[in-house]
C-alpha cells in the first residue's frame, strides 16, 4: 500500500516552494545604500551590479526594466548608450518595451535606426 501524503505535508511543501521562488526576483534595489541591479540564477545565486547612480534623482520606470537618474538611462542594469535622461520616457501600448528621448527611439537598450521620436 502506497504511503498517503497528509494535507499538512502538502501544505508545507507548497509553502517551501513559494518561499524559494518569491526570493528569486530580479531588479533595481538598494544594496548597502547604493542603487544596484540584482539578478539571480541557480548556478551562482544573487549577482549584484552596482550602478553608480545619483541617489537623489534615481527613478525606476514602468515595469522595472528601465531606470534613470539625472545623467544616465539603464535597461536591466546596463547603461543605454546615447540616451538622454532628461527627456527619456517609456512608450505606452504594444507588447514590446519601447522608449524614446528627444533624439532617438529605443527597443530595450538598442537604438531603433531611422525612427522619429516626435
Give the positions of each predicted feature.
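Non-catalytic tandem-repeat scaffold regions and their flanking low-complexity/translocation tails
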Residues: 24-118
Amino acid at each position: 500500500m502506497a504511503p498517503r501524503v497528509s494535507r499538512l505535508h502538502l501544505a508545507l511543501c507548497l509553502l517551501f516552494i513559494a518561499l524559494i521562488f518569491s526570493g528569486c526576483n530580479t531588479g533595481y534595489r538598494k544594496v548597502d545604500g547604493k542603487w544596484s541591479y540584482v539578478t539571480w540564477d541557480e548556478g551562482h545565486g544573487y549577482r549584484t551590479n552596482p550602478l553608480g547612480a545619483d541617489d537623489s534623482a534615481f527613478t525606476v520606470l514602468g515595469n522595472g526594466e528601465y531606470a534613470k537618474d539625472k545623467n544616465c538611462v539603464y535597461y536591466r542594469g546596463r547603461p543605454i548608450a546615447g540616451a538622454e535622461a532628461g527627456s527619456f520616457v517609456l512608450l505606452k501600448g504594444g507588447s514590446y518595451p519601447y522608449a524614446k528621448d528627444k533624439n532617438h527611439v529605443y527597443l530595450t537598450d538598442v537604438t531603433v535606426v531611422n525612427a522619429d521620436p516626435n
